[in-house]
Amino acid sequence: QGEVCMDNIILRCDNNINGIFTAIYDAFVYKNQMQKENHEVYRDNISIEIGIGGNYSLFSKMIDIETDEIKVQKTILTIQKKLGFKIYETVFDALCHYSDNRATIVLGFLVRAFKVGQRIMEHMTDKYVMEVFELSRKVNKEADKIRGFIRFSDNGNYLLAHFEPKCDMIPVVMWHFVDRYPGENFVIYDDRRRHAVVHPRLKECFYINEREFKQLERSVPVKTDSFEQLWKVYFEHTDIRERFNPQCQRNLCPKWYRKNMVEFT
């Protein structure tokens, strides 16, 4: 990894789960190296910056991190083995939040968790512990909505769903739809982050980027889904006009989800 001579280190990683897990792995390498060289207690002086850009500091060492699948798997297995699957899920969900500080928060959480083990759940007064659980809670709250709001259309070759979640929802909700539609070809595209997950019938899922998704769209003839119109008619004719409450509807189904819900288009 090279010598570390600065008091503060900023690790800059790719803007995805694997990039962050790689940075977390390297953060612990640097942390252990700094403690060995300086014989001091770690002071949370390593942070993780996600994606390009960000603020530079004259008093920090900026290190670019290249995503490494081996480091990703080692990090995941270590968390699961030492802290348990429940805490791993909490960490994973927190990393799917949109906060720019989510990786640094999770790093601070893991530094503390590896010291006390699963008893970290009892340390809710700690800033990092509290923030990780809060990020995870918000991600799960949105995931509950997404599972109900996502809409698939059938183009004759596969089912396609578009959505624009605030958090990175594909890693969180895709297994719900894999379990629900194991025998279907389907694609879920995140218009905000411009990537998609593809589920071939009875096979493993994989990710594609925006360019690959556009190629997939062009390769399939446009076909109207007749059930879309039937669903619109059903939606419009099953409501009770006397009980129409737009404010309540907005609370239960916020407007930013409706763009990709066929009954509102």
Write out the residue ranges for each language-model feature.
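Acidic, Ser/Thr-rich peripheral helices and adjacent loops at domain boundaries
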Residues: 61-67, 203-216
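Short, hydrophobic/amphipathic alpha-helical patches that form generic packing surfaces
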Residues: 19-30, 107-109, 172-179, 229-236
